[in-house]
Amino acid sequence: MQRLPEPLKALVEQLSRLPGLGPKSALRLAMTLLKWPASETRRLGRAVHDLRDNLHLCGRCGALTDVDPCGICTDPARSGETLCLVSEWDSLLTLEEGGFYKGQYLILGGLLAPLDNLHADSLELDRLTKRMAEGTVREVVMALGTTVEAENTATYIRNMIVRQYPQVRVTRLAQGIPLGSEVKFMDRETLRQSMQYRQDL
């Protein structure tokens, strides 16, 4: 890297700061960019610039958006009675790709993890409290995963909601054996939850 021209070296250093890109991968990417027409590299530069200047968090749900409130929050076809809690924006994107959920969202901005210094005040619980105070939410769906941190977060939020809004139903995503899997390959906890939450045929 010492013999690289300064502009190339500077770009490689910046690219290698991205997750999953080491110096060699960053150099390959930079060399690819050098082969692009100048108009394309300028377009890429503008897109990166616009990303920082034009994106912000939706004041209602916490999603990344270029308008506030976001398109999901303002969509009249979505039910305001169901509020799905997710830890991060990528979980919202995954649920949206499925096309089966027609309620609204709230992004918590993480999960409770005291060992990592992530406590309740680190989460978007004020935003949740405001949404609940509006009085339209009838069900809160916890779509947080099954890690210890997710379980702790779900329990904490459930207790908070039940205490303040006992009429609101609190649910979680079903857990169990994934589609296409065999029982003999499942871990004990997955089997336990599958048995506990079994369904009628």
Swiss-Prot record:
CDD domains: TOPRIM_recR. InterPro entries: DNA_Rcmb_RecR (IPR000093), Rcmb_RecR (IPR023627), Rcmb_RecR_Znf (IPR015967), TOPRIM_dom (IPR006171), TOPRIM_RecR (IPR034137). One of its GO terms (biological process) is DNA repair. Keywords: DNA damage, DNA recombination, DNA repair, Metal-binding, Zinc, Zinc-finger. Residues 81-178 form the Toprim domain. A zinc finger (C4-type) spans 58-73. GO terms for molecular function: DNA binding; zinc ion binding. The keyword Metal-binding applies. May play a role in DNA repair. It seems to be involved in an RecBC-independent recombinational process of DNA repair. It may act with RecF and RecO. PANTHER family: RECOMBINATION PROTEIN RECR. Belongs to the RecR family. This is Recombination protein RecR. It comes from Nitratidesulfovibrio vulgaris (strain DSM 19637 / Miyazaki F).
